[in-house]
Amino acid sequence: MAAAVTVEEVRRAQRAEGPATVLAIGTATPANCVYQADYPDYYFRITKSEHMVELKEKFKRMCDKSQIRKRYMHLTEEILQENPNMCAYMAPSLDARQDIVVVEVPKLGKAAAQKAIKEWGQPRSRITHLVFCTTSGVDMPGADYQLAKMLGLRPNVSRLMMYQQGCFAGGTVLRVAKDLAENNRGARVLAVCSEITAVTFRGPSESHLDSMVGQALFGDGAAAVIVGSDPDEAVERPLFQMVSASQTILPDSEGAIDGHLREVGLTFHLLKDVPGLISKNIERALGDAFTPLGISDWNSIFWVAHPGGPAILDQVEAKVGLDKERMRATRHVLSEYGNMSSACVLFILDEMRKRSAEDGHATTGEGMDWGVLFGFGPGLTVETVVLHSVPITAGAAA
């Protein structure tokens, strides 16, 4: 009789050999594009708030300072005219909002996922795990179930649905995908972030300027990545390796960013010192992540930072003495798409690997080997992912 297999032997066989690797990235936005220069006039007109002249001037200044050129939004003028309660500052409107996002969030996620799967080039039956993240609405079964059905994933795909996480969650999906890939040999994880502002859009209020900050910054977008360990380089092309991933709550930051799902939709509340809280703690986060690697020059690594707003990026740059070039991909995504909550950092990863190839860099990380990805959001929560780039071959740049 053969000896029984030990638990240790089973565990060894279950685990992957190498680190989790990003194998493909796809992004998608709604068709409706909104230019920031035109937005204050449109926003105050559609919300019937044109009599608030001083408030409109404040909002115009917010938009001017946002460093955003354009955003994409599912909400069109027609949809808002049909749903006037969504245009008030506080009016019962959750049903109307839910009716939109429950359909559109998985649909936008599908568009991004299809692009990632196409780039990956493998049959979707090889997808073993699905992680879906959104702060836009809630449903049962969730957006993960809807997406699995839309894509025709196998019925036994292992799903994880993350609702109501907020702007840090692009880092969260990578951290979770990393653990899934490294602890399940042969796993291929489809991780998707899909965000639609229909749940947060509301009219202006003179007594709640923090709500208007969100109206000036937020945009719609979805991004998807395929993550797996031990890539088969005959048919799979690695983009970035994930070396470590961690989450922390910043000290003395309670209430800095809050969101509450109510009859009136999702309301956001921001404290002014959010950029200060993040910049004050950024060096500790970098030190915790990179001291084990012997790295302390923050200009020697590539940067992917959630662009919560320009003030956060400005203060982080100043605090750690970053060259302007380090945040180029991050600022490009802020400019061209706005703050898409959890999806942003995946858009930035996509921009970075594409720009690195176009500019003739030796690696996917702007020619550098090591990099950091930061997510910032409610808590105040910070996600830190240490990345390692891969060499760009002549074929990969094509």
From Swiss-Prot:
It catalyses: (E)-4-coumaroyl-CoA + 3 malonyl-CoA + 3 H(+) = 2',4,4',6'-tetrahydroxychalcone + 3 CO2 + 4 CoA. GO terms for molecular function: naringenin-chalcone synthase activity. Its EC number is 2.3.1.74. Keywords: Acyltransferase, Flavonoid biosynthesis, Transferase. Pfam families: Chal_sti_synt_C, Chal_sti_synt_N. CoA binds at residues 58-65, 311. It is an enzyme of class 2 (transferase). It comes from the Eukaryota. Substrate binds at residues 200, 219-220. The active site is at 167 (acyl-thioester intermediate). SUPFAM superfamilies: Thiolase-like. Pathway: Secondary metabolite biosynthesis; flavonoid biosynthesis. PROSITE patterns: CHALCONE_SYNTH. InterPro entries: Chalcone/stilbene_synt_C, Chalcone/stilbene_synt_N, Chalcone/stilbene_synthase_AS, Polyketide_synthase_type-III, Thiolase-like. The keyword Acyltransferase applies. One of its GO terms (biological process) is polyketide biosynthetic process. Homodimer. Belongs to the thiolase-like superfamily. Chalcone/stilbene synthases family. The primary product of this enzyme is 4,2',4',6'-tetrahydroxychalcone (also termed naringenin-chalcone or chalcone) which can under specific conditions spontaneously isomerize into naringenin. This is Chalcone synthase 1.
